[in-house]
Amino acid sequence: MRRWHLIPIGFVALVVIGLPVLVLTNSGIKHDLKVDLGFSTGECEPTANPASGWETRQSLPYELDEPRAATLDGEIYLAGGQLNVSEESDGRLYIESSDEFTRFDPKSETFTELKPLPRPLNHVGVVAYRHHIYVLGGYEERRDENTGREFFRYDPKTNSWSQMPPMPRARAAAAMGMVGAELIVAAGARNSEPVSETVAYDFQSGRWRTLPPMPSRREHVGTAVVGDRLYVLGGRSPDSLAVDTAESYDVSERRWHTLPRMPVPTGGLGAVSIEGDVIAVGGGNDDNATVTGAVQEFDPLTERWKLLSPLRIARHGQATAAVGDTIWVFGGAPCAYTNETDSVETLEVKGGQ
């Protein structure tokens, strides 16, 4: 089952940038929308970097924007996303949400379709904990009215979903990560407005509690965990502009730390941790209508950033996960909002490249 949610056409930023190396085929409605918004051909021409150190892998079974991922027992689980766009007579864009839930085996590069999400969602949070996958929040229908607070658990042994205690308040496009036995949730959007609220779910007590708020209000952020710290990277400001803000929450100290700014401002990015470093991948900037392939590595010990090899195909809104020292990216949009892709890439990070 798939569900459509709608947003005002003014909310959408379309991107046509870079080299005409890869042109994705648009449906008629996508082509017309781009022409209406000022792009002469309406075609998506993503930024491509053939010299990139990233490798092209087996494509997704479907084109998908804004999925999310988590790694469990050496396999990657992909949840939700956006599938398609159409324009209705009232001038609004209807975006089809996905209930797809898929397991990917990096060794064989095969996808296995699992029991669908309890409902079609996009911009969810996904984490793994003690042999289960947890999916939280997200958008279901209209962005400014239907942000979710539901909390679901997936059991791989039974291929079944169960309901968990919902978040105190709804949010989507948030930062989520496991620190010990607690799921920390920070940033994100509620009814299209970025929030700074931070909460934690304690798996031992089965209760939610409030933590100190994040210093900044951001959504569409990247998230990774190293030790006792949750890192929240980049994202979009209340003006929907990409930011270079980086902050971390220290669970043992119960306080936030402001970190050195990222080299490249970006929102709609992915992030992972490998060998104690935090790596931000891709994203975009609505302010200057760009999608970036930048891959930015942060060393928590030296508090320094450096750039790694950029994505082969720049994108934002992709699912990002790590298995061992390899980063995987799935889908996303090489041109903002209306060009889902099935592209999959990997980068092997050796000793902090």
Q: Where do the protein language model's features map onto the residues?
A:
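Kelch-like beta-propeller repeat domains
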Residues: W4-P8, G18-Q353
